[in-house]
């Protein structure tokens, strides 16, 4: 059982105190205990199964703390397993796939939870096995590693709970098979949404001038277009100008639709009041629900933010209070929309503007009634209790982990999605904090057929024109799921797997936007590669997929918006810090313009030589495989999110449907139909 950490709560699984653990780490030599029989072995695709016995372990230990060379006898036992592939893994996995399966069993007369971990030659940690639970009598965990690298692995036996020391037995198999080959994406069927991707240009250096490059803003030496992890995006519905914000820069993009394909002119319009960059957030109060097209730029700064706004597309900015108090220390969000009835008696701006942020235990939201200049008090949106000085979640009614971005529906209901919310049975599920009274009170509602993945990424929510809400999330199995509610989250439709047409086995960064009540778009990064996406050894190739519904979520049309250009090769890290696979940071963003055209702002982690070089990945580099280039995927064909504009090609009347897409409808329950490759990707 791992030590699970999230911003909402910490679940300890150790029988050791922290001080004892510190003594252990400082006084124990950096060596692995190897007292099992035998202490080492080798396995290949032709060797058949190998097996061994682990020595007895007990007493409990903390696992996965980042110190993989310490394995004290009696609490841990290692077995060195040399894995031999027919060819080096970098070349072998271009055409083949493999699975290393460890069946780990034990018997004890008292409740016992033993765990097995597999530590790769590069130090990547896989495990524990499944089921990760407590048993009396016989116990079992099965750990499967997909596409393991060659070299010496440490297979580790530890005890999360073992009042009586227990030995374990391991049987390991290695199977290989030809990697399924998918044909190139089919030409998009008529009506399939299609996209063109616009990457930010390089900084201008003499003698180069825009539009072939981007001129850094006054006072900046760079526009930081390659530092665009966790971007947010907005569009001014009056001028058509798009904004993508990441780091300390607000990039303005002007599209020229008089030519085909449209061209993009990039400018650095950063706010002079964005002095620091911790978490950057941009929000445009666009014309979707009658907004003024005011754009907000927020930079987290301690327990508030440096917030400013522009009413002239970034030519000038006005600083504001930043947030109400109290406020959280992480992962802030700015959003807005119509007021719920009854509206405040005094307001000087047509929409409520919300500032929400994650604190150590709960999360707070405050509301502005003057267009973001000042904010009222921050109010907690989750419920916790304190037991013996320790904050504990209350089920139901609380969420842990990091929340997503606040969204407001036409009827004024405010929604803050979260990946880990507890239902009445204490099960952690994706859910949403809901306020129907302009942020004064909140209630948490969960999706009953969803289950949280850890570590995960933010879910996303959006409301249609008649208040139907769409919640996109990554499920416990790693799949991209989306659920629909027409009563503010009291009841949900059965979640649909948007990645089915392309065989998506792992997804990250769910982002949702809606238009007409029955239309929505769901963007996510996905890969058909199974396995642990947090592992340094993960070799998945990630693309940007966007699913559309035109019938309130009954069926979805999924397209690959980056069919010939991966967004990432390798792992995508979700646990903070400076891991090399955290180049994309925590999320992407999505919006819609006044023509119903969907735009997705994302960081491209695989650029230049990485696009075609299969040996590159985010773990080992080079820099082209660890990039975060500001990029916009802009819809150029197919039906958008407003039925009134169907067939106009977003008012350009070009009829252009150039792009990559695969028209596929349905899910496993209702059946898949569409293009010839719908079931082969």
Regions inferred by a protein language model and the residue ranges of each:
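Short linear Ser/Thr-Pro motifs
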Residues: 19, 130-136, 562-566
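Boundary at the C-terminal end of the N-terminal hydrophobic targeting segment
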Residues: 30-33
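C-terminal PAP-associated
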Residues: 36-97, 101, 107-109, 164-165, ...
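Noncatalytic accessory or regulatory domains flanking protease catalytic cores in secreted, cell-surface
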Residues: 117-171
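Bacterial N-terminal signal peptides
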Residues: 10-26
């Amino acid at each position: 059982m791992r030590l699970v950490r999230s911003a909402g709560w910490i679940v300890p699984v150790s029988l050791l105190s922290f001080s004892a653990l510190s003594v252990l780490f400082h006084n124990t030599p950096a060596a692995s205990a190897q007292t099992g029989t035998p202490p080492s072995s080798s396995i290949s695709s032709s060797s058949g199964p190998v097996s061994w016995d682990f020595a007895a372990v007990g007493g409990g230990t903390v696992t996965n703390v980042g110190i993989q060379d310490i394995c004290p006898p009696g609490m841990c036992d290692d077995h060195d397993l040399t894995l031999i592939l027919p060819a080096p893994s970098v070349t072998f996995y271009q055409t083949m796939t493999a699975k290393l399966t460890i069946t780990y069993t034990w018997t004890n007369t008292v409740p016992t939870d033993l765990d097995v971990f597999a530590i790769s030659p590069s130090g990547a940690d896989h495990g524990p096995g499944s089921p990760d639970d407590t048993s009396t009598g016989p116990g079992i965990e099965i750990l499967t590693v997909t596409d393991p690298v060659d070299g010496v692995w440490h297979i580790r036996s530890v005890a999360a709970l073992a009042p009586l020391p227990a030995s374990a037995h391991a049987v390991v198999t290695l199977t290989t098979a030809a990697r399924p080959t998918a044909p190139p994406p089919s030409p998009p069927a008529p009506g399939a949404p299609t996209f063109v991707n616009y990457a930010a240009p390089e900084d201008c250096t003499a003698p180069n001038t825009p539009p072939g490059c981007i001129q850094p803003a006054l006072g900046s030496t760079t526009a930081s277009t390659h530092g665009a992890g966790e971007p947010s995006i907005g569009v001014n519905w009056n001028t058509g100008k798009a904004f993508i914000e990441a780091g300390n820069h607000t990039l303005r993009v002007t599209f020229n639709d008089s030519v085909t394909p449209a061209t993009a002119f990039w400018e650095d319009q950063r706010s002079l009041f964005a002095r620091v960059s911790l978490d950057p957030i941009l929000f445009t109060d666009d014309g979707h629900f009658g907004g003024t097209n005011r754009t907000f730029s927020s930079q987290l700064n301690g327990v508030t933010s440096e917030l400013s706004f522009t009413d002239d597309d970034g030519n000038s900015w006005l600083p504001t209070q930043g947030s109400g108090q109290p406020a959280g220390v992480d992962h802030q969000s700015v959003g807005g929309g119509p007021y719920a009835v009854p509206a405040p008696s005094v307001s000087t701006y047509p929409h409520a503007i919300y500032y929400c942020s994650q604190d150590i235990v709960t999360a707070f939201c405050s509301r502005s009634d003057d267009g973001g200049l000042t904010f009222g008090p921050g109010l907690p949106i989750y419920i916790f209790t304190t037991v013996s000085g320790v904050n504990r979640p209350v089920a139901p009614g609380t969420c842990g982990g990091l929340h997503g971005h606040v969204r407001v529906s036409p009827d004024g209901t405010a929604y803050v999605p979260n990946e880990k919310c507890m239902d009445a049975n204490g099960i952690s599920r994706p859910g949403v904090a809901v306020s129907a009274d302009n942020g004064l009170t909140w209630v948490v509602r969960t999706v009953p057929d969803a289950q949280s993945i850890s570590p995960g990424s933010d879910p996303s929510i959006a409301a249609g024109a008649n208040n139907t809400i769409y919640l996109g999330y990554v499920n416990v199995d790693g799949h991209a799921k989306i659920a629909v509610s027409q009563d503010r989250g009291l009841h949900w439709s059965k979640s649909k797997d948007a990645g089915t047409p392309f065989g998506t086995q792992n997804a990250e960064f769910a982002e949702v936007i809606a238009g007409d009540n029955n239309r929505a778009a769901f963007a996510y990064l996905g890969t058909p590669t199974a396995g642990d996406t947090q592992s340094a050894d993960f070799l998945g190739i990630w693309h940007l997929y966007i699913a559309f519904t035109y019938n309130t979520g009954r069926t979805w049309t999924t397209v690959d918006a980056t069919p010939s250009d991966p967004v990432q090769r390798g792992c995508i890290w979700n646990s903070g810090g400076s891991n090399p696979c955290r180049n994309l940071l925590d999320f992407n963003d999505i919006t819609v313009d006044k023509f119903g055209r969907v735009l997705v702002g994302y960081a491209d982690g695989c650029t230049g030589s990485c696009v075609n070089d299969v040996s590159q990945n985010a773990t080992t580099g080079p820099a082209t495989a660890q990039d975060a280039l500001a990029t916009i995927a802009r819809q150029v064909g197919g039906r958008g999110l407003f039925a009134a504009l169907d067939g106009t090609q977003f008012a350009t009347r070009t009829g252009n449907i150039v792009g990559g897409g695969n028209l596929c409808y349905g899910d496993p329950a209702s059946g898949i139909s569409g293009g010839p490759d719908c079931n082969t990707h």
